[in-house]
């Protein structure tokens, strides 16, 4: 039998589909999410409803976002979930989560087994809506979770680490082996909880400036910041900010990146924006 077929559905590579089928793992994830009636629960990529069913059983209403037309149609006719579901058959990357939270009347609790081929850009999309999100629980490639939680001075630490930790508290929940899926992915997976900060620990004046600095620094991560960010900061300014110009991108903390971003926001008129 084709191991890409699960419950009569052929997993589609272009959608990054791997279907969760390990009941212990499913129960552990649902327990971590702890869905409650009355909450604005939103699932991204419900697939064959491995998480949708146990979460939906606890709720009166559940919103799901599913790109695959066939899977969305299956959910509409689901024997007991159908009436509870609000289904958006679209790419989550095009979803306005702010408008959705407004429509639902409260911050969203977002969860899902994210397609690994779009997980990083989707995370950045969601970060732009953290004002509208209470928390997020995602199954991701373990390597991505390692990057989300990484601190300075580690190989896994990068732009995703800085931006995720700027917006959220990042908490690893559990690791999941390939055998928990059909078809088994070639990588280990992990579940992570992201809780947007109620008060930003290191507020920045302009998020686009923080984004620019981290992009430029980590695109040249082997260079010292004297060189990688030399077009934005002089050695004197870095020293004044208490940042060693001989450090590399991976040595700089989230707080220091935010400090640099705020200095640059205040001094952008003298530099190109």
UniProtKB/Swiss-Prot annotation:
Record has RNA-binding as a keyword: yes
SUPFAM superfamilies from the UniProt entry: S-adenosyl-L-methionine-dependent methyltransferases
E.C. code: 2.1.1.182
Pfam families, alphabetized: RrnaAD
SMART domains referenced in this protein's UniProt entry, alphabetically: rADc
Binding site for S-adenosyl-L-methionine: 18, 20, 45, 66, 91, 113
InterPro entries on file: KsgA/Erm, rRNA_Ade_diMease-like_C, rRNA_Ade_Mease_Trfase_CS, rRNA_Ade_methylase_Trfase_N, rRNA_adenine_dimethylase, SAM-dependent_MTases_sf
Cellular component per GO, a single term: cytosol
Keyword Translocase attached: no
Top-level taxon of the source organism: Bacteria
Catalysed conversion reaction: adenosine(1518)/adenosine(1519) in 16S rRNA + 4 S-adenosyl-L-methionine = N(6)-dimethyladenosine(1518)/N(6)-dimethyladenosine(1519) in 16S rRNA + 4 S-adenosyl-L-homocysteine + 4 H(+)
Major place of residence: cytoplasm
One of the record's GO molecular function terms: 16S rRNA (adenine(1518)-N(6)/adenine(1519)-N(6))-dimethyltransferase activity
Functional description taken from the UniProt entry: Specifically dimethylates two adjacent adenosines (A1518 and A1519) in the loop of a conserved hairpin near the 3'-end of 16S rRNA in the 30S particle. May play a critical role in biogenesis of 30S subunits.
Protein name per its UniProtKB record: Ribosomal RNA small subunit methyltransferase A
């Amino acid at each position: 039998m084709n191991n890409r077929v699960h419950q009569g559905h052929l997993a589609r590579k272009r959608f990054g589909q791997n279907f969760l089928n390990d009941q212990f793992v499913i129960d552990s994830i649902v327990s971590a999410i702890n869905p409650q009636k009355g909450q604005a629960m939103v699932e991204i990529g419900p697939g064959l409803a491995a998480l949708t069913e146990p979460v939906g059983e606890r709720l009166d209403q559940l919103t799901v976002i599913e790109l695959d037309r066939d899977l969305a149609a299956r959910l509409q006719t689901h024997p007991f979930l159908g009436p509870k579901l609000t289904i958006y058959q679209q790419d989550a990357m095009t979803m306005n989560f702010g408008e959705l939270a407004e429509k639902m009347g409260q911050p969203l609790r977002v969860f899902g087994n994210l397609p690994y081929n779009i997980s990083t850009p989707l995370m950045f999309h969601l970060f732009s809506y953290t004002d509208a999100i209470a928390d997020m629980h995602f199954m991701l490639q373990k390597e991505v979770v390692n990057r989300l939680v990484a601190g300075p001075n580690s190989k896994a630490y990068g732009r995703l680490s800085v931006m995720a930790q700027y917006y959220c508290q990042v908490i690893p929940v559990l690791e999941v082996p390939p055998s928990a899926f059909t078809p088994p992915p070639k990588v280990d997976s992990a579940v992570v909880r992201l809780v947007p900060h109620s008060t930003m620990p290191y507020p920045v004046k302009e998020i686009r400036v923080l984004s620019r600095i981290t992009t430029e620094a980590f695109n040249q991560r082997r260079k010292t910041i004297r060189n990688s960010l030399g077009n934005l900061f002089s050695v004197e300014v870095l020293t004044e900010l208490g940042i060693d110009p001989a450090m590399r991108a991976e040595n700089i903390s989230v707080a220091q990146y935010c400090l640099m971003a705020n200095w640059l926001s205040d001094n952008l008129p003298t530099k190109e924006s």
